[in-house]
Amino acid sequence: MEKKFKLLLLALGALTLFSACSSTQSDIRGEGNQRALAIAASKTLKKPVIYEKKWKTTGKVAMMDTFTDGKLDGEFRRYYLNGNLVMRGYWKDGVVDGIWEDYYPNGKVLMSGYMKGNKEIGNWKYYNESGQLLGEVPYDQIPEEIIDIKHTNLANFWTDIQNGK
């Protein structure tokens, strides 16, 4: 049951992933309707618009996304309460496409690889919590305990967001 809950949280989180940053972008920071405003502004302004959400308890950035012409496009980032990255990746025209990295809460890379059309492709590297490379294999061969850490970290992130931290 706990695993199903984590997978549900992961799926919900994946549905709301976004992207970040461009030198010709407009910045919109806030919550709630601010995301919808960023999407609309990106259509009107015809340039990338950043949406940024901060943790209420720390004031640090929780997530950064970029919208271009109303779609997710470019780098996205998610952050732990401590300010370290949870994950970062890239969207292209609304589809996950590019380098993808997941992180331990201490800031070290957990795993990294490449996404194309919302799917993991090629070999992925995975690391221990000290940052030491443990292996490089196709995504479906990454040890289950590494994937479980990834899912747990993401589920915890979305739980913190939902709890208004």
Language model features: what each stretch is:
Residues M1-L8:
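Bacterial N-terminal signal peptides that target proteins for export
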Residues L9-L17:
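Bacterial N-terminal signal peptides
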Residues S19-K165:
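Glycine/tyrosine- and acidic-biased, solvent-exposed loop/turn segments at the edges of beta-strands
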